[in-house]
């Protein structure tokens, strides 16, 4: 159409010239005729350029103008910038409505950020992830981590953990939505240059598919807004970030569940999952597979007062054992399976100036209670790396936790993680059956906020734990850690923002080691380490 308009314009412009040439042909010389033709051609080219420019402006998306700074003489301050051109603030997009041209412009303005989000939503694919990686060295050879779950993470972890999630929307019509989700996680070694998965001599390089499930909305008439999922997935995890373990964690081989179901003032999460375990005999040389199932139920986001919410949770794990498996437990020395449960509540308070604090109370029995008594990592597992063993006799354990962060004025922030635990008549990995324990661990991390991108601070950690075995013998484990750090950040929050690049110097000391006999290199009870670590999520 554009080319046809140009040709028509050219013919109309040439027509008067042709008529004039015919009427004056007899009185003009050849030179005069050529001069008139050249003049008409120049005028035609000028008109064509004018129409072309107008058409280009009409169909090219406009950008929002930016002001140009000038110097005292009125010239642009930097007419030839060395950096690349700045992005436009907005773009024009064409409206799809049929009557858009009648009501106004057929184009509307949209910021680049909104346009990018629109494209992602239209495609329906997202790629999210997390990883950490860094360099470190210590005063006596290779640096070692110790009691991260009690002393804190800064300057005390040398792993390269990662989580990568792929999510694709496959249907979104008529009030119904379907997404396919896959999560890959694992660890990449930070000691040797090679990191082949399966070459696991150092226990570092491994990978797994931790999630592979379908999640939907709109298929359940009684809960159209809830997320209904089926596949390899567990209930949502709740982490004490500074200690790198979870207060709520239900691992799953496969399951079915419902999340964010609005009931009354709050929301319900419920999951029924399978997690088979390896049941060992007393020599820890032979094992048998036992089929277990977990019901995890939570009532969350219950409003209490301004910026405060409550969650109530319960979890029960039972086994579906065969006759031969029970016979092995009765007659062949295999450990008896004992059902286990955990119940509790948590309160989250958000602050006016930013930050939050979360308080939780949990009580458990048998194998979950046993994991309350671990000082290195205390997530509420039913097993130890999938292995089930120990004489569980109905003992219980209690755990109180606090974690959060708070701003103090405009230039200070402090994060905390404090845990108090005790248990009676539990099975301990270190002191055996019928053990009692009591422990307290505390980590605080104050920092000075230079600006949005820089913080300088210290992380202080201390813990002490005492176990008492069936014969009333006492075993003590304790230590402390001091880490000086400077971080490059993209936001001021310590617990809810990443990227974070840390430069640190750490002194860590084991005061007592009667539970694990741990030592650093050269049988030292202390270690000084320096390093740099990057941690990011997206």
From Swiss-Prot:
It comes from Shigella flexneri. GO terms for cellular component: cell outer membrane; pore complex. This is Putative outer membrane porin BglH. Residues 62-73 have a biased composition (Polar residues). Its main location: membrane. GO terms for molecular function: carbohydrate transmembrane transporter activity; porin activity. May be a sugar porin with a broad carbohydrate specificity. Residues 52-82 are annotated as: Disordered. Residues 1-25 form the signal peptide. Keywords: Cell outer membrane, Ion transport, Membrane, Porin, Signal, Transmembrane, Transmembrane beta strand, Transport. InterPro entries: G_neg_Bact_CarbUptk_Porin, LamB-type_porin_N_dom, Porin_LamB, Porin_LamB_sf. Belongs to the porin LamB (TC 1.B.3) family. It is a multi-pass membrane protein. GO terms for biological process: monoatomic ion transport; polysaccharide transport. It is found in: Cell outer membrane. The lineage of its organism: Bacteria, Pseudomonadati, Pseudomonadota, Gammaproteobacteria, Enterobacterales.
């Amino acid at each position: 159409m554009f080319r046809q308009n140009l040709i028509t314009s050219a013919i109309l412009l040439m027509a008067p010239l042709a008529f004039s040439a015919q009427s004056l042909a007899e009185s003009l010389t050849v030179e005069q005729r050529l001069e008139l033709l050249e003049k008409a051609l120049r005028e035609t080219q000028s008109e064509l350029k004018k129409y072309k420019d107008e058409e280009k402006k009409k169909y090219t998306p406009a950008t929002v103008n930016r002001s140009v700074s000038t110097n005292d003489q009125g010239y642009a301050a930097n007419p030839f910038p060395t950096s690349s051109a700045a992005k436009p603030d907005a773009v024009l997009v064409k409206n799809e409505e049929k009557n858009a041209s009648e009501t106004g412009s057929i184009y509307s303005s949209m910021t680049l950020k909104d346009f990018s989000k629109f494209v992602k939503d239209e495609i329906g694919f997202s790629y999210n992830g997390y990883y950490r990686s860094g360099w470190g060295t210590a005063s006596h050879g290779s640096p070692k981590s110790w009691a991260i779950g009690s002393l804190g993470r800064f300057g005390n972890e040398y792993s390269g953990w990662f989580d990568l999630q792929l999510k694709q929307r496959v249907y979104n019509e008529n009030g119904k939505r379907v997404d396919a989700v896959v999560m890959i996680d694992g660890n990449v070694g930070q000691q040797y240059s090679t990191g082949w998965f399966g070459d696991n001599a150092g226990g570092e390089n491994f990978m797994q598919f931790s999630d592979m499930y379908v999640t939907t909305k709109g298929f359940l008439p009684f809960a159209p807004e809830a997320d209904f999922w089926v596949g390899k997935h567990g209930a949502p995890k709740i982490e004490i970030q500074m200690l790198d373990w979870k207060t709520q964690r239900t691992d799953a081989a496969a399951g079915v569940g419902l999340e964010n179901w609005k009931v009354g003032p709050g929301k319900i999460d419920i999951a029924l999952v399978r997690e088979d375990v390896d049941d060992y005999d007393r020599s820890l040389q032979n094992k048998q597979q036992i089929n277990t199932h977990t019901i995890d139920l939570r009532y969350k986001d219950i409003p209490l007062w301004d910026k405060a919410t409550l969650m109530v949770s319960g979890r029960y794990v039972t086994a579906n054992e065969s006759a031969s498996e029970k016979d092995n437990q009765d007659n062949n020395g295999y450990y008896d399976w004992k059902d286990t449960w955990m119940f509790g509540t948590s309160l989250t308070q958000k602050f006016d100036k930013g930050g939050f604090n979360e308080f939780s109370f949990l009580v458990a029995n048998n194998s979950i209670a046993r994991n309350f008594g671990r000082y290195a990592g205390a997530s509420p597992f039913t097993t130890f790396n999938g292995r089930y063993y120990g004489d569980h006799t109905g003992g219980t354990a209690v755990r109180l936790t606090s974690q959060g962060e708070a701003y103090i004025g405009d230039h200070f922030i402090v994060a905390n993680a404090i845990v108090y635990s005790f248990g009676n008549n539990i099975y301990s990995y270190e002191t055996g059956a019928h053990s009692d324990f009591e422990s307290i661990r505390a980590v605080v991390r104050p920092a000075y906020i230079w600006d949005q991108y820089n913080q300088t601070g210290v992380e202080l950690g201390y813990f002490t734990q005492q176990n008492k075995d069936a014969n009333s013998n006492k075993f003590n484990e304790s230590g402390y850690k001091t880490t000086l750090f400077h971080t490059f950040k993209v936001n001021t929050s310590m617990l809810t923002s990443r990227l974070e690049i840390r430069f640190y110097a750490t002194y860590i000391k084991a005061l007592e080691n009667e539970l694990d006999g741990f030592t650093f290199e050269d049988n030292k009870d202390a270690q000084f380490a320096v390093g740099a670590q990057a941690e990011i999520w997206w």
